[in-house]
Amino acid sequence: NRDPRRVEVGRRRRSMGTQRALGRRRPRSPETLDVDLIALVDRLARRLRNAHRVCRTVTLRLRFDDLSRATRSHTLPEATADTVTLLHAGRALLAIAMPDIATRGITLIGITFGNLFADDAVQLALPFDGASSEAIDTTLDRVHERFGSSAVTRGVLLGRHQGLQVPLLPDR
């Protein structure tokens, strides 16, 4: 079969995501799922910043024990690549899904950042509360680039295997 449509080059991705298969070995506690979510968001937010992108939509993907799937999404008021903001959105979505997870079990958790924009095309907001984690994110990104992804990590992720990392195409 041939697709008659022309190939579009130079078009940027509209979303990026990552997921983790959990298997059916044992039930997952909410705390364990939270740690899995932290690892996914941390890795994906770093990838988002490395691509010089920001996102407005966070989508949580789930696969249950019966192999059915569900997604939950939230659109942020402004585009961001801030790890803490994205993690809060992901945690809120996971909290909404917890009753389904408790009754149906879970075999996969994934997170997708959508509605992407170039980071220089977004109007910056003034941080009136003085609390911005942009400096922390930038510093951690530089440490990871220079010394590897396991040089510095969140305390909750210490001693945990984060799964295999697959090579990725550039996020242009």
Language-model segments: what does each one mean?
Residues 78-172:
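Acidic, metal-coordinating catalytic segment for phosphate/diphosphate chemistry
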Residues 1-103:
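DNA-contacting surface of Y-family translesion DNA polymerases
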